[in-house]
Amino acid sequence: MKRQLLAFPVALMSLSASLAFAGGAPANQAPASYPVADSYLGEKLYPNEEAIAQGMASVIEATIRKQYQAGNARRDAHPKAHGCVKAEFKVDDKLADRFAKGVFIPGKTYPAWIRFSNGNPDPNKPDIEGNERGMSIKLLDVPGEKILESERQDTTQDFIMMSNPAFFLKDPSNAVAFFTALGSDSALAKAKIPFILGAHETATLLKINTKKISNPMQTRYWSPVPYQLGVGPNRMAIKFSARSCSTAQDPLPDHPGPNFLREAMVNTLKKGDVCMEFLIQPRTSDKLDVEDALDEWEESDAPFYKVATIRIPQQVFDTPEQQKFCENLSYTPWHALPEHKPLGGINRLRKVVYERISAVRHEMNQAERKEP
């Protein structure tokens, strides 16, 4: 178990503006306000939650500054990209009225950038090692004022997913202790991680950390944490998911190279377009917990509904220029319209962490931070 713990993924939570997850606001910018809990949708702030978020951001920032030299700072979570691809996100022509909110305008098509990634904090880990995988969608040309204070007028909307339907941290209560241990050079500190997490969270993390895939574009992804759909009295809590339009699966190669998942994407997109479906899962009962990120909403209790089709056209994406562009992109669930506000304690932490870490990364790399 100790060997596995050393390879634990720093999951989505570890980033704050892109956190794809670091402590205050960027220079020349006022500190962002901490999210207000929506009790109508089941949210509830944890004791000292904002201080936890700032502490977590500081721990992760220190790890980034220790791990990377200026000019080469990577994301703290999902630092290895299998590729960033151009895509189209087409909302279905016919949608139930209760789903036709925010970006889900029937028949609307958005250009998009999609980043497929590996969750291990070590960007040099070979792809064959089991791990969490990520799919982050950035829709472009999305009008309307956004939630994130520093980017209110930007025209993007992000959807962030991972290859497991449940997150490995239940709530903010043990986040600082976990990331402190994870960022430590001490094997003893890392050995304490199972005790910090508890049995259920450790089991979930080990499940995430041992999963292997053969092609990122044939893998299913979920938002393990919930989001709002709509505003006003008819707003609801949802989760979302993306999956291939086809059930075909590539076999794992007999002798995989260290970057075979990128190679699988290259080969797939040489042959033609890729189709994926985007689905939403409305919360159907108060028993489906908004604050517990370990709580998988079973499809038997809360079915998924398809709302859009993602088309990734045939393309060449593995160029140095596109890889640099991909590295400079920031993804955060708070790049969002109010109709898609992130919900739950883990998402609230991410607002602080993603914002700080993205700013730190771009500052260390002397790269301008802006949305495409």
Features from the language model and the residues they span:
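Active-site-adjacent core segments of small-molecule enzymes
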Residues: 23-372
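Gram-negative bacterial Sec-dependent N-terminal signal peptides
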Residues: 1-21
